[in-house]
Design a protein with these regions (language model features):
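Cationic, low-complexity basic patches in intrinsically disordered or flexible, solvent-exposed regions
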Residues: 4, 10-12
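ATP/NTP phosphate-donor binding region
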Residues: 17-85
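Glycine-rich beta-strand-to-loop/alpha-helix junction loops that act as flexible
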Residues: 34, 88-90, 111-113
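ATP/nucleoside-binding phosphotransfer catalytic cores, i.e., glycine-rich phosphate-binding loops
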Residues: 41, 201, 232, 242-288
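Catalytic core of DAGKc-family lipid kinases
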Residues: 55, 103-107, 113-212
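Short Gly/Thr/Asp-enriched flexible loops that form oxyanion-binding sites at enzyme active sites
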Residues: 92-106
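Glycine-rich phosphate/pyrophosphate-binding beta-alpha loops
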Residues: 159, 214-228
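Gly/Ser/Thr-rich active-site loops/lids in small-molecule metabolic enzymes
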Residues: 175-180, 229-249
Length: 288
């Protein structure tokens, strides 16, 4: 029997993050994921120690020790009256902290320290931790949207199907990187079984047999892989990307398009903006 997997909608102007601007004294908490991209994380810690303005901030640094610990630390920061929580980590940690802060008056600050850094890149945050820390020092705010997938907030992407299967396999790898992701995609494509999705988007009903459906709040997965080039983090909408069936050789073409920002121009891709969407699947499948 069919299973409802996603009820997805954006929440407009739901999360603030720290941008360049006016300098102010603030109480903040810094959360560090110690297993996130070890080289980036170590450099981030050095840059925090060297460049964070101690005259402007009252702060403490806490490291996550177990799965979802960042959520607990973020809730503590809110209870303690912090005005911002700064996360030095990758997309997973950033999403945990951001989702916890969504709907509060506490801002999210990001020092990118992961392997993909999709949301950070979409927001124009420097991949250089020195500049990211200096950005925190300036302490200006920008408000962005979040998405809701089955009631759970997300900052960047949600989806079902092939890309979720690749992401699941990728996260289990000790060695990561562009080539590893490409090869895992090839392997998963050979094994992955497509299914038909029943979709209701803002009252429009249709069916699609597809490799995947992504719901994007921002343009990219990470590493400048632009799955939804026209997505905006502050337009009050989410961008749906439906990858229709394609011949095996087209994987190479689509992968190239993904990094050229032209995926939406492929005849195998359907994109549209929406405010609310419900997806029903033929069978349970991995999601993200």
């Amino acid at each position: 029997s069919a299973q409802l997997r996603y009820s997805v909608k954006p929440k407009q102007n739901d999360l603030r993050f720290v941008e360049e601007g006016v300098r102010m004294k603030r109480k903040i908490k810094i959360i560090v994921n110690p297993v996130s991209g070890s080289g980036r994380r170590k450099k981030a810690l050095r840059m925090i120690d060297k460049h964070l303005d101690r005259e402007k901030f009252e702060f403490e640094i806490q490291k996550t020790e177990y799965h979802r610990h960042a959520i607990e630390l973020t809730n503590q920061a809110v209870a303690e009256g912090c005005e911002a929580v700064i996360i030095a980590g990758g997309d997973g940690s950033i999403n945990e902290v951001g989702a916890t802060l969504a709907g509060t008056n506490v801002a999210l600050g990001i020092i990118p320290a992961g392997s993909g850094n999709g949301l950070s890149r979409s927001l124009g945050i420097s991949m250089n931790p020195k500049f990211a820390v200096e950005n925190i020092n300036n302490f200006n705010f920008r408000t962005i949207d979040t998405g809701l997938a089955n009631g759970m907030p997300f900052m960047n992407m949600a989806g079902v199907g092939f890309d979720a299967a690749v992401a699941d396999a990728f996260h289990k790898q000790k060695m990561r990187g562009f080539i590893k992701y490409f090869l895992l995609g090839l392997k998963t494509l050979r094994e992955y079984k497509l299914q038909t999705y029943s979709i209701v988007a803002d009252g429009r009903e249709f069916e699609r047999r597809a490799h995947l459906i992504s719901m994007a709040n921002s343009p990219q997965y990470g590493n400048d892989a632009l799955v939804a080039p026209k997505a905006l983090v502050d337009d009050g909408m989410l961008d749906a990307v439906v990858v229709n069936p394609f011949p095996f050789y087209q994987y190479f073409v689509l992968f190239y398009r993904l990094f050229q920002g032209t995926l939406n121009e492929s005849p195998h891709i359907k994109t549209f903006k929406f405010k609310e969407m419900k997806i029903t699947q033929e069978r349970p499948d991995v999601s993200h």
